[in-house]
Amino acid sequence: MAKQDVIELEGTVLDTLPNAMFKVELENGHEILAHVSGKIRMNYIRILPGDKVTVEMSPYDLSRGRITYRYK
C-alpha cells in the first residue's frame, strides 16, 4: 500500500476487541475495525475506549483501518 493511497480520518474508540483490534466510530458516523500501527505498539501506548485517534484507511477496504495516532 503506497503512502499516497491512504485516507486519513479522525474518530473515537468505542470498544476494545481481542488481538489489539478496536471498534472506531469515525467523524462521519461510520464504524470500522482498526488495528494498532507498529510504532504505537512498540512504544506501549495504551488506547482505551473514548480516546480520540487518527485512522489510516485503504481505499480498497473501507471497513478496516490502522490507528496511527492517539490524541492526548
From Swiss-Prot:
It is found in: Cytoplasm. It comes from the Bacteria. GO terms for cellular component: cytosol. The keyword RNA-binding applies. Its main location: cytoplasm. The keyword rRNA-binding applies. Signal peptide: none annotated. GO terms for molecular function: ribosome binding; rRNA binding; translation initiation factor activity. Keywords: Cytoplasm, Initiation factor, Protein biosynthesis, RNA-binding, rRNA-binding. Pfam families: eIF-1a. CDD domains: S1_IF1. SMART domains: S1. Residues 1-72 form the S1-like domain. PANTHER family: TRANSLATION INITIATION FACTOR IF-1, CHLOROPLASTIC. One of the essential components for the initiation of protein synthesis. Stabilizes the binding of IF-2 and IF-3 on the 30S subunit to which N-formylmethionyl-tRNA(fMet) subsequently binds. Helps modulate mRNA selection, yielding the 30S pre-initiation complex (PIC). Upon addition of the 50S ribosomal subunit IF-1, IF-2 and IF-3 are released leaving the mature 70S translation initiation complex. NCBIfam families: infA. HAMAP family: IF_1 (MF_00075). Belongs to the IF-1 family. This is Translation initiation factor IF-1. The gene is infA.
